[in-house]
Regions:
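Kelch-like beta-propeller repeat domains
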Residues: 1-490
Length: 490
């Protein structure tokens, strides 16, 4: 069954922290990519001092290191539990907000950056407003858009901010300009071809009556404009659903799948897809359409884009945080055929505060789970998709380490004649079923010899924001290579 369903392995060691957030880091000083796990206070108000924190997993070596968490002005570790996260063009992970207070929750304004080269945290300029459960999206210029989340006073923030590495944070719609609609916490938002942002309708806890919509960012001092997008079924049952910009990104289709009608409510298996633009132009009035349903109703699940241009879904439960109704079986969606296939079952139950992401070798890791404050799932699972069992994988012998927008470049591979696709996949930075970072962008094949591909990168910065990407080649059997890292320079 491995050739159709893939296979799971539970590793013999565990994470030293609860991986509420996970981000794939570009290669460090030793040349190896690693995964950063973030716990902060780990959903435990009694956690103090050295127990706050993060861990860097060297998955090739099977080892962990523990970066020192910076201290706030009161001398306490900054608590990035339930922060927002997004990658900067230089590979650093920007982490904004977090937990100022428990019960009732209030957000932090602190902002940190994690450097994959030094494996160290640094403090950068704080936001204007605190944010707990915010959304962060990297823009075409490498700046980061942050919205929603609870402020220092516990109310939902409706004034987005943008972070520039050169000047810090600035409010997009400063008062007295009107705020945005009250976008839900951890809103699933994606950058589109034309620079607009799309809120899919996925959220945490409450959508506040806000439907899916397109957001057009202003030229200062203008204000954000919004265009509602209709057609989404079960709009009020998308709590901790999963959304993806379907591969390849230039097709501009967004899928939303699953979700619940409340934090402890019943999950849905419904799936919707919306076409937001064509190669020629934006769709003037995009509308969601019903797509084939998941086999299993899910919330708290993860959706991961694979280098064979499919989407792998794992984890979650048919009802809130119920382990008894947990879904262990995975599912794989193929956009080319518009069909779902059941995948292998994971041994470990993954519920609230679980996360999954793609590794450069094509495997998927699944970690975390925290259905109650006294329950922490530290085991690590690794999934091998079906392409691991379909024959020899193509090999990238060499490729550039940096490339500019619109540039042509060479990929050396002995399988050049058999290559079907060249893909760039942006590394994940995921939490709470929300991953605004991951996207797969097609790289056009211009010509080939028996040992090389001549390809051209898109000139559209919105389709592939600046930063580090995994470069995969995929053969005619839909079997991908191991990735090479490449940096798109601003």
């Amino acid at each position: 069954m491995s050739a159709t369903q893939g296979s799971w392995e539970t590793l013999t060691y565990q994470s030293p922290v609860l991986p509420i957030h996970a981000a794939l880091l570009s290669p460090g000083a030793d040349g190896r990519a690693k995964v950063l796990f973030l716990a902060g206070s780990g959903n435990n108000p009694d956690t103090t001092g050295e127990l706050y924190g993060s861990a860097v997993w060297d998955y090739e070596q099977g080892t962990f290191s523990r970066p020192v968490t910076p201290l706030n002005s009161a001398g306490n570790p900054i608590d990035f539990f339930c922060a927002g996260q997004s990658f900067l063009a230089d590979g650093r992970l920007l982490v904004m907000g977090g937990t100022e207070r428990y019960d009732p929750f209030e957000g932090l304004s602190d902002t940190l950056a994690f450097d994959p080269k030094t494996l160290e945290w640094t403090i950068v300029q704080s936001m204007e407003s605190g944010r707990w459960y915010p959304t962060a999206v990297t823009l075409r210029d490498g700046n980061v858009f942050a919205c929603s989340g609870k402020e220092e006073n516990g109310f939902l923030d409706t004034y987005p901010e943008i972070y520039s590495p050169s000047i810090g944070w600035s409010v997009v719609n400063p008062t007295p300009n009107p705020p945005t609609s009250p976008l839900g916490m951890y809103s699933a938002i994606f950058l589109l071809r034309d620079g607009r942002l799309f809120y899919s309708g996925g959220y945490f806890d409450n959508n506040n009556g806000v439907s899916p919509r397109l957001l057009t960012l202003p030229t200062p001092p203008g204000t954000i404009t919004e265009q509602p997008v209709g057609g989404l079924t079960d709009m009020n049952s998308r709590d901790q659903s999963a959304s993806v910009l379907l591969p390849p990104a230039d097709q501009q289709q967004v899928m939303i799948m699953g979700g619940g009608n409340s934090f402890y409510g019943t999950a849905t298996n419904s799936v919707n897809i919306v076409q937001l633009s064509t190669a020629a132009r934006a769709v003037s009035n995009p509308t969601y359409k019903v797509a084939p349903a998941l086999k299993y109703a899910r919330m708290h699940h993860s959706a991961v884009i694979l280098p064979d241009r499919t989407v792998f879904v794992c984890g979650g439960s048919g009802m809130g945080e119920s382990g008894a109704m947990a879904t262990k079986a995975g599912e794989i969606y193929n956009p080319a055929t518009n069909t779902w296939t059941e995948a292998a079952s994971e041994e470990v139950v993954r519920l609230y505060h679980s996360v999954a992401l793609l590794l450069p070798d094509g495997r998927v890791i699944s970690v975390g789970g925290n259905p109650a404050r006294d329950s922490q799932e530290l085991r690590i699972s690794v999934y091998k998709p079906p392409y691991f069992f379909k024959g020899t994988r193509p090999v990238i012998n060499s490729a550039p380490v940096k490339v500019a927008y619109g540039a042509s470049f060479q990929i050396q591979t002995p399988q050049a004649r058999a290559i079907k696709w060249v893909n760039l996949i942006r590394p994940s930075a995921a939490t709470h079923s929300c991953d605004t970072e991951q996207r797969l962008q097609n790289v056009v094949i211009n010509s080939r010899t028996s040992t090389a591909l001549n390809v051209t990168l898109t000139s559209n910065r919105n389709l592939a924001p600046p930063g580090f990407y995994m470069l995969f080649i995929t053969d005619n059997n839909n079997v991908p290579s191991i990735a090479k890292w490449i940096q798109i320079t601003p």
